[in-house]
Amino acid sequence: MICLVTGATLFAQRGFYGRDVRLGFKIDPVFVNTLRPLENGIEKDGSGFGVNYGLMADIQFSDSRGAFATGLEVQHASSSLLYKDAGKGLYRDEAVGAEQSYKLKLQYLQIPLSVKLKSNENNGFRWWGQFGTYMGALIGSRLDYSYGNTSEENINAMNKTNKLNMGLLVGAGGEYRLAQKTDLYFGVGFENGFTDITKNKDWKDDKVALNRWALRLGVFF
């Protein structure tokens, strides 16, 4: 990422709004975080709010009708699961058949990789759509759990959570030119997780993926 930022300062200035590489900052309110279990006996038990924030970089195509979009961002996510199967769950032995409720609070250092296509500019405004993937490295995992009359909060769950999260990234929105080299960026995005969030050897469950819906808000310079 350091190479990307350094290289961006050395690019010739041409293309859309007079530059090949656009850098910016973003903050994405995440209004849906859902842990999605793929087997019976485990249910979604609520969706949490979250936020993404960090650096954006658009490497412009030569015709300025699109870009390779990447960046570096911190992702915060939280969601809950209800384990009804007595043979599954992190505290299945202690729960002795009782339903177990878990709330995972996750943090990732994430790199999005996507192609962003753009419409023609009209009065400083243009539409965009993107399709790609993302890779996230786990940097924080805390857990709240309860079963029967027992409960505990903010347990360190780094060793019980898989260290990598990957998935499909899609989004759409618009850009509006505020000044010669300042563009307002906005839209909506969806992240469909492919990887398993919970370690199966500890949780004795099948795949549990993380899906997210977020608003895209940022400024390019």
Regions found by a protein language model. Name each.
Residues 25-29, 51-59, 72-74, 111-117, ...:
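Residues on the lipid-exposed face of transmembrane beta-strands in outer-membrane beta-barrel proteins
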Residues 65, 70-80:
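Early exported N-terminus immediately downstream of N-terminal targeting peptides
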Residues 14, 77, 165-170, 175-221:
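Predominantly the C-terminal beta-signal and adjacent terminal strand-loop region
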